[in-house]
Amino acid sequence: IANPTSNQTYTLTATDNSSGCTATDQVVVTVNITPPVAEAGNNFTIDCNQNSTGAGIGMSAVNGVTYSWSPTTGLTNGSISNPNAAPASTQTYTLTATNSLNGCVATDNVTVTVNTTAPTANAGTGFTKNCTSNTSGSQIGMATASGVNYAWSPSTGLNSTTVSNPTANPSVTTTYTLTATNQSNGCTASSLVVVNVDTQAPLANAGPDVEI
């Protein structure tokens, strides 16, 4: 059995024991066990700030090599060397490269992390400002969450537009929009609240002056 680790030429010599005559023959064993190169690419993150539509993974194709990816979830093509990856959740992809000439294979992995969790936005419960209740306005919004930025629009009648729970004291009925932004991934959520203003005084008419 011949099992060399590199190309070898073997020579067989046969000798006739009675005459001493010899004959030779050669056989060449070619060793072709070179694996292909598999490069799955660099890990990356999909969030609301970057790579929102995914990104390319893998490598440039090499002649004589076939490629397959597993899993194929979120890939534009699971049988090319460099598909676009846009999974809905975090995935680790395995690239298998196969040398078509010798069947040798190589593998490599790449992880696509998906971080698209939106924050919670709750603009609070609307209220009515009139001459007897909420005369100085009232608080709207929600408790502050760590790692979240807040922005209110419009700013009219608010004591702050960048806190989660400002006091609203508009002079006319106003619909406020709260936008919450996750600092870690740029994802946003929004919510509305209406503050009704009913401060129109009634008409008072005592009539003309009279002389008694």
Regions found by a protein language model. Give the residues of each.
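A short beta-strand segment in extracellular, disulfide-stabilized domains
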Residues: 50-62, 133-145
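Solvent-exposed segments in extracellular or luminal domains encompassing
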Residues: 1-10, 79-93, 162-176
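Interdomain boundary/hinge segments at the C-termini of tandem beta-sandwich modules
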Residues: 27-33, 110-116, 193-199
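Short, exposed coil/turn segments at beta-strand boundaries within extracellular/luminal domains
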Residues: 18-24, 101-107, 184-190
